[in-house]
Swiss-Prot record:
Protein's name in the database: Superoxide dismutase [Fe]
Coiled-coil regions listed: none
Membrane-traversing stretches: none
Family matches, as SUPFAM superfamilies: Fe,Mn superoxide dismutase (SOD), C-terminal domain, Fe,Mn superoxide dismutase (SOD), N-terminal domain
Length: 192
């Protein structure tokens, strides 16, 4: 059976940008519900002894939705850090500059893509097969993990439960908080 992955930091560590209350609901209830539901769906199926990644890449319907949301959320928690924010460094910084010309231009591009990502969704920074970066949007539980030649680097969760307690319906303010928490160390590890 799958278990809810622990947060990689204390439940109040992302304050003031993301509150303890948001994490109590988002991690403790929403993320956990996907785990409970997946554990109820897979006994006796071909997915029973597969890894989470294998399930995400070979399932559909309710099994896919719950497995992908477990994976997406765990990736999201790691995309954030109480010691994050600021400008990127290392290979990711070089790749951002190569694609967008500057960190500010990249931020503007990601913000634009995220603000205009309709409904329950995710915005991802991904590495393409040629080594360049791109920003992609996915809806519902969809994830670039299922795309050949695409490596997820960072994500921002745009389901309303990710920000409604702290920011109500003002997604751009939530994104300002995201930039104060973005985990460039995690991004560089994924890019390598």
């Amino acid at each position: 059976a799958f278990e809810l992955p622990s947060l990689p930091y204390a439940i109040d560590a992302l304050e003031p940008h993301i509150s303890k209350e948001t994490l109590e609901f988002h991690h403790g209830k929403h993320h956990n519900t996907y785990v409970v539901k997946l554990n109820g769906l897979i006994p006796g199926t071909k997915f029973e002894n597969k890894s989470l990644e294998e399930i995400v890449c070979s399932s559909d319907g309710g099994v896919f939705n719950n497995a992908a949301q477990i994976w997406n959320h765990t990736f999201y928690w790691n995309s954030l850090s109480p010691n994050g924010g600021g400008a990127p460094t290392g290979a990711v910084a070089d790749a951002i500059n190569a694609k967008w010309g500057s960190f500010d231009a990249f931020k503007e591009a990601l913000n634009d893509k995220a603000v205009n990502n309709f409904g329950s969704s995710w915005t991802w920074l991904v590495k393409l097969a040629d080594g360049s970066l791109d920003i992609v949007n996915t809806s519902n539980a969809a994830t670039p993990l299922t795309d050949d030649g695409v490596t997820p680097i960072l994500t921002v969760d745009l389901w309303e439960h990710a920000y409604y307690i702290d920011y109500r319906n003002v997604r751009p303010d939530y994104l300002k908080g995201f930039w104060s928490l973005v985990n460039w160390e995690f991004a560089n590890a994924n890019f390598a």
